[in-house]
């Protein structure tokens, strides 16, 4: 696939075309459908899913080209606001205040935006400690590690929850995102909701400098830093956890490992946000739920588009691509490539009506 064109917002210095996934089944279609090129940008957590979606959509629409730049959630939102991309991917939705204040260049003023939680995935707490593959940790301990209140792997707070694990006398290196990140916002949202006595910085996209730790750019940078370090721990979209050790988090009286099913379960018990438009399906995650089998460290990544575009050029491709992404075929393709959880039938019905109305 050719490299994406430069957007009108200066944050895009260099774009990266996605390598198409070979494992996605072709959707039904004869390949003679829509044509034209559209540009999207945003969350690096969606990269594997976007590869699957692009391949599946283009197999049915061979004259269409989808160019996606995984520059991060904040960059994607800024690029969409400025008109450098016709859709954005973000690990957090725009706030109600941002929607009211921003002038979305590509959108007809007053028509609002569409936000679909199209990618649901657990955030894995990953670590690299020799001889240890899995740990049980409660929220307060996780927060203590990332605020550096707990800085040794054999600290009693960790050891007491893992009595059968041989923990080393080794310093903990906590790795966080250096860039503005929706993954960070979701991870800190979990800490803020479940361990506010330890994590008092709130749900934020930019890591607080006072907590220190090692910084790394984007999802791949965090995974590389944890993989290549010693005694490291970090957080990343679960599709990128690989062979690293992972944490089961305490929910009620049980420790729950990450899984697509557990991520979907927490979304099902969570409401939509208040004060939003009819095509804005932002979810307020109930991270301190004690329901059995839910995994609260979850990332809901959104696809964001205009309800009505200023330019009618390529609107059919935009609508068609989003229709494929949320379809059962598209969601299955993402699940196969990225380990994400398919959206629920209720959300599919609501989102489908909104996407069909794009003009």
Regions found by a protein language model. Give the residues of each.
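Periplasmic-binding protein-like
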Residues: 137-160, 323-347
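Bacterial N-terminal signal peptides that target proteins for export
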Residues: 1-11
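N-terminal segment of the mature folded domain
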Residues: 28-159, 223-225, 236-242
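C-terminal motif of bacterial Sec signal peptides marking the signal peptidase cleavage site
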Residues: 17-22
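Flexible, solvent-exposed loop/hinge segments that line or gate ligand/substrate-binding clefts
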Residues: 94, 200-328, 335-359
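Second-shell loop/turn segments in exported
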Residues: 36-42, 65-68, 112-113, 127-133, ...
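Extracytoplasmic ligand-binding site segments that recognize negatively charged/polar headgroups
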Residues: 122-126, 132-220
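Extracellular/periplasmic catalytic domains that process cell-envelope and extracellular macromolecules
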Residues: 80-82, 107-110, 116-119, 136, ...
């Amino acid at each position: 696939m050719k490299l994406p064109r430069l957007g009108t917002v200066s944050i895009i210095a260099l774009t990266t075309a996605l390598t198409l996934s070979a494992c996605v089944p072709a959707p039904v279609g004869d390949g003679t459908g829509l044509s034209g090129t559209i540009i999207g940008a945003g969350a690096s957590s969606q990269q594997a899913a976007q590869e699957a979606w692009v391949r599946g959509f283009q197999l049915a629409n061979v004259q269409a080209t989808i160019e996606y730049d995984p520059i991060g959630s904040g960059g994607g939102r800024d690029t969409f606001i400025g008109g450098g991309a016709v859709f954005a991917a973000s690990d957090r939705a725009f706030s109600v205040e941002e929607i009211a204040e921003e002038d979305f260049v590509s959108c007809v003023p007053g028509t609002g935006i569409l936000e679909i939680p199209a990618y649901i995935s657990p955030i894995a707490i990953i670590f690299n400690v020799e001889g240890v593959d899995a740990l049980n940790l409660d929220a307060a301990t996780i927060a203590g590690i990332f605020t550096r209140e707990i800085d040794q792997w054999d600290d009693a707070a960790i050891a007491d929850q893992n009595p059968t694990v041989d923990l080393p006398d080794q310093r903990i290196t906590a790795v966080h995102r250096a860039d503005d990140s929706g993954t960070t916002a979701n991870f800190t949202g979990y800490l803020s909701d479940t361990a506010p006595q330890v994590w008092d910085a709130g749900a934020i996209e930019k890591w607080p400098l006072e907590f220190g730790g090692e910084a790394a750019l984007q999802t791949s940078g965090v995974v590389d830093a944890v993989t290549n370090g010693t005694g490291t721990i970090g957080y990343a979209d679960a599709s990128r956890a690989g062979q690293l050790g992972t944490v089961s988090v305490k929910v009620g009286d049980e420790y729950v490992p990450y899984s697509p099913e557990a991520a979907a379960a927490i979304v099902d018990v969570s409401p939509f946000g208040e004060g939003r438009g009819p095509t804005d399906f932002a979810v307020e995650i109930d991270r301190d739920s004690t329901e059995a089998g839910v995994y609260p460290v979850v990332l809901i990544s959104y696809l964001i588009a205009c309800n009505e575009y200023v330019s009618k050029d390529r609107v059919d491709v935009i609508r068609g691509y989003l229709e494929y992404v949320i379809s059962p075929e598209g969601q299955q393709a993402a699940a196969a490539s990225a380990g994400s959880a398919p959206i629920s039938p209720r959300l599919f019905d609501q989102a489908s009506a909104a996407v069909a109305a794009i003009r």
